[in-house]
């Protein structure tokens, strides 16, 4: 079975304001399969956001690889990587499109890179699918 997301020896090193290197991710390897429900826990500055940003492609790894559905996307631009994944923030109402519903955000993600056509009609046709996805996540976003 192919992992949906696979990180292998993922490392992210940054320089602070004094040219000192700080290791944010250190040789992280993980596999996420269909139907997995995972939680990433850690204190402030532990690397949770860095992990998600490297998977999404908004930050590059210093070393290691990222595969999505078996394809190495490590060097893909965020735009090219968006073909494979999107994310909705924990509180999407506070994110980059606060006036959009979670379902509207999911619709944009679903058709990224395609002509969108009649947005309300497409949204209505995927309403049940998106509602089921949102209910899996919970967190008060069901409505």
Task: Write out the residue ranges for each language-model feature.
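Q-loop/switch helix immediately C-terminal to the Walker
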Residues: 99-115
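Helix-to-loop junction immediately C-terminal to a conserved catalytic motif
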Residues: 56
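The feature captures the beta-strand-to-loop junction immediately N-terminal to the Walker
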Residues: 41-43
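Pre-Walker A (P-loop) beta-loop-beta motif of ABC nucleotide-binding domains
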Residues: 28-39
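Conserved ABC transporter NBD signature motif
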Residues: 64-72
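ABC ATPase NBD coupling module
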Residues: 72-86, 116-123
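ABC nucleotide-binding domain signature
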Residues: 39, 79-90, 94
């Amino acid at each position: 079975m192919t992992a949906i997301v696979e990180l292998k020896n993922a490392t992210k090193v940054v320089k602070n304001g004094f040219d000192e290197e700080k290791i944010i991710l250190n040789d992280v390897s993980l596999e996420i399969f269909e139907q997995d429900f995972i939680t990433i826990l850690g204190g402030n500055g532990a690397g949770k956001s860095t992990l998600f940003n490297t998977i999404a492609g908004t930050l590059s790894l210093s070393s290691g690889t990222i595969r999505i559905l078996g394809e190495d996307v490590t060097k893909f631009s965020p735009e090219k990587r968006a073909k494979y994944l999107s994310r909705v923030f924990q509180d999407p109402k506070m994110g980059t499109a606060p006036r959009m519903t979670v379902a509207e955000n999911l619709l944009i993600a679903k058709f990224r890179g395609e002509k969108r056509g009649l947005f309300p009609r497409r949204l209505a046709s995927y309403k049940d699918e998106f509602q089921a996805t949102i209910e899996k996540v919970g967190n008060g976003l069901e409505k």
